[in-house]
Amino acid sequence: MGRKWNNIKDKKASKDANTSRIYAKFGREIYVAAKQGEPDPESNQALRVVLERAKTYNVPRTIIDRAVEKAKGGSEENYDELRYEGFGPNGAMVIVDTLTNNVNRTAADVRAAFSKNSGNMGVNGSVAYMFDATAVIGLEGKTSDEVLEILMEADVDARDILEEEDSVIVYAEPDQFHAVQSALKGAGVEEFTVAELTMLAQSDVTLPEDAQAQFEKMVDALEDLEDVQQVYHNVDLGE
């Protein structure tokens, strides 16, 4: 699959460590998930996914509780979930998922992040067909064979199970996210190193050094935007 998931997560977390930006993004996502459904994760699958992801980033309980209470309190603050697609240097493909309360601002900010870094925004569907929605679950303390056996016994399907350094990474259909976690928890797994619903490129590309530097600058500019929740791409950054 070409992605070292723990490295990617650690890089994102360290980049945001001093500003708590990642916590703010999770706070917004938790609020939206809780407001759109029940504020109880047992009956709100979208909220459960966000909370499981938040655990892997060590999001403080106070951030989570504040977002849920805000949703419970009937806040009138509304966010739209919007997806933008575009191209970076050398035609690299990028998907940007946002939560925004000002569509015009977000569209302008995303377009500027692309255009200022040798990229350009595309139309809906211009790159998404080259990505697959995927659940990615990572854990330690088991081998890939052991994980396969656990999932088979629980009658849970996975697309792929790979070993990455000290972790095992499970790739599955998005609707299998909770089933994979439940099966593993039932087998004694208490913590997950990765818990993501992502858009996974069907094939990765490698960029020349100068183009990769420009591409990473563009991704950083996109991730720095307040309204941007996730940036997906098809570039192998060698992480």
UniProtKB/Swiss-Prot annotation:
Pfam families: TACO1_YebC_N, Transcrip_reg. Its main location: cytoplasm. Gene3D superfamilies: 1.10.10.200, 3.30.70.980. It comes from the Bacteria. GO terms for biological process: regulation of DNA-templated transcription. Keywords: Cytoplasm, DNA-binding, Transcription, Transcription regulation. The keyword Cytoplasm applies. It is found in: Cytoplasm. One of its GO terms (cellular component) is cytosol. The keyword Nucleotidyltransferase does not apply. GO terms for molecular function: DNA binding. NCBIfam families: PRK00110.1 (NF001030), PRK12378.1 (NF009044), YebC/PmpR family DNA-binding transcriptional regulator (TIGR01033). HAMAP family: Transcrip_reg_TACO1, Transcrip_reg_TACO1_YeeN. Belongs to the TACO1 family. YeeN subfamily. This is Probable transcriptional regulatory protein BC_0539. It comes from Bacillus cereus (strain ATCC 14579 / DSM 31 / CCUG 7414 / JCM 2152 / NBRC 15305 / NCIMB 9373 / NCTC 2599 / NRRL B-3711).
